[in-house]
């Protein structure tokens, strides 16, 4: 499909079918499409509203072109990731939860980048903690093997995005590329806890992950507009398990947690996020620890470590209280420094 034909299709609010979208994405990612046409097409898709099929096709091309991290299959492998864009400016909840999960029996292949709309992206806080994030795919694999935790800095694995990045920067609005990152884990983690910035994306992205062959997935959206499981409101959930999809809501009270404002979880920089992360892993009581336990518990459930989210929360608390989660952070940082 030519870019001009694709643009005409989206202007008419008609779907671009799978093979056409695959062809179009390959052209975009190889630099064959001009910046003007890229901007027009992705704007048209946004206005039309991207379909499950269009997103799945685009993600399949991103996966095909990504530089992979080759690790043995493990049913406890999980990615904990968010689309960002929720404008909540909370500390790095998913990054903190990832260390808890790795300490409690999961294996984490975390995929992320620098801040776009938040105060601190995953890459920013890990660097603030002293980790070396500029690892080769082989070094990331070695880190996962040694520590049970690895971080894949997105620009190192999606080099074809260089043709799109300047367009996205200049446009400054959400497009299909905001939701492709969480769908394209270079290590191929079979399980995912994915936070999304809009309620409509819960049902859409859990079905995209189903089409992409994921095993277990929780797509979540806090109804206070958080792209995590929230302490401040009910959370919408789309669950994929054994090929079946369920959609439901969960509440903090379901797990004996008190609903509370996110105000005390906000940060203004990676340094502030670092301090909050260290406080949680140091077992400092408060809402930050509670929201991390809630999200880590869900990740342990989706990673086949816990039998339920509630069981996962118990395991998360134990990993923090015992010092295992903080030890996992230190182990990871030391492992990455060996490659500096």
Curated annotation (Swiss-Prot):
Residue pairs linked by disulfide bridges in the UniProt entry: none
Subunit and partners: Homodimer.
Keyword DNA-binding attached: no
A cellular component annotation (GO) from this entry: cytosol
Reaction it catalyzes: N-(5-phospho-beta-D-ribosyl)anthranilate + diphosphate = 5-phospho-alpha-D-ribose 1-diphosphate + anthranilate
Keywords noted in UniProt: Amino-acid biosynthesis, Aromatic amino acid biosynthesis, Glycosyltransferase, Magnesium, Metal-binding, Transferase, Tryptophan biosynthesis
EC number: 2.4.2.18
InterPro entries (UniProt xref): Anthranilate_Pribosyl_Tfrase, Glycosyl_Trfase_fam3, Glycosyl_Trfase_fam3_N_dom, Glycosyl_Trfase_fam3_N_dom_sf, Nuc_phospho_transferase
NCBIfam families for this protein: trpD
Family matches, as PANTHER family: ANTHRANILATE PHOSPHORIBOSYLTRANSFERASE
Pfam families named in the record: Glycos_trans_3N, Glycos_transf_3
Residues that coordinate or bind Mg(2+) 1: 94, 228
List of residues binding anthranilate 1: 82
Biological processes, Gene Ontology terms: L-tryptophan biosynthetic process
Protein name: Anthranilate phosphoribosyltransferase
Origin superkingdom: Bacteria
Gene: trpD
Obligatory cofactor(s): Mg(2+)
Binding site for anthranilate 2: 168
Binding site for Mg(2+) 2: 227-228
Cofactor binding note: Binds 2 magnesium ions per monomer.
């Amino acid at each position: 499909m030519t870019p001009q034909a694709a643009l005409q299709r989206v202007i008419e609010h008609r779907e671009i079918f799978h093979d056409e979208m695959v062809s179009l994405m390959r052209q975009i990612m190889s630099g064959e499409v001009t910046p003007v046409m890229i901007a027009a097409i992705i704007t048209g898709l946004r206005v039309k509203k991207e379909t499950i099929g269009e997103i799945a096709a685009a993600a399949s091309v991103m996966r095909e072109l990504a530089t992979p991290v080759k690790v043995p299959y493990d049913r406890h492998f999980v990615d904990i990731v968010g689309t960002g864009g929720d404008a909540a400016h909370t500390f790095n909840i998913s990054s903190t939860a990832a260390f808890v999960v790795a300490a409690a029996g999961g294996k984490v292949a975390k995929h992320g980048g620098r801040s776009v709309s938040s105060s601190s992206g995953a890459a920013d806080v890990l660097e603030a903690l002293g980790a070396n994030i500029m690892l080769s795919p082989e070094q990331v694999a070695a880190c996962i093997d040694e520590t049970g935790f690895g971080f894949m800095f997105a620009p190192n694995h999606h080099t074809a995005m260089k043709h799109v990045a300047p367009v996205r920067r200049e446009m400054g609005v959400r497009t299909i590329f905001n939701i492709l990152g969480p769908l394209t884990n270079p290590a191929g983690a079979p399980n995912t806890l994915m936070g999304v910035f809009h309620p409509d994306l819960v049902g859409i992205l859990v079905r995209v992950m189903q089409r992409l062959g994921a095993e277990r997935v929780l797509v979540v959206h806090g109804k206070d507009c958080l792209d995590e499981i929230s302490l401040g409101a009910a959370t919408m959930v789309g669950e994929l398990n054994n090929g079946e999809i369920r959609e439901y809501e969960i509440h903090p009270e379901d797990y004996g947690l008190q609903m509370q404002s996110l105000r005390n979880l906000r940060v203004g920089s990676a340094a502030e996020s670092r301090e909050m992360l260290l406080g949680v892993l140091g077992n400092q009581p408060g809402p930050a620890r509670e929201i991390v336990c809630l999200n880590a518990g869900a990740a342990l459930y989706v990673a086949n470590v816990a039998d339920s989210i509630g069981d996962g929360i118990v395991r998360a608390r134990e990993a923090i209280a015992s010092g295992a989660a903080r030890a996992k952070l230190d182990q990871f940082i030391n492992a990455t420094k060996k490659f500096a």
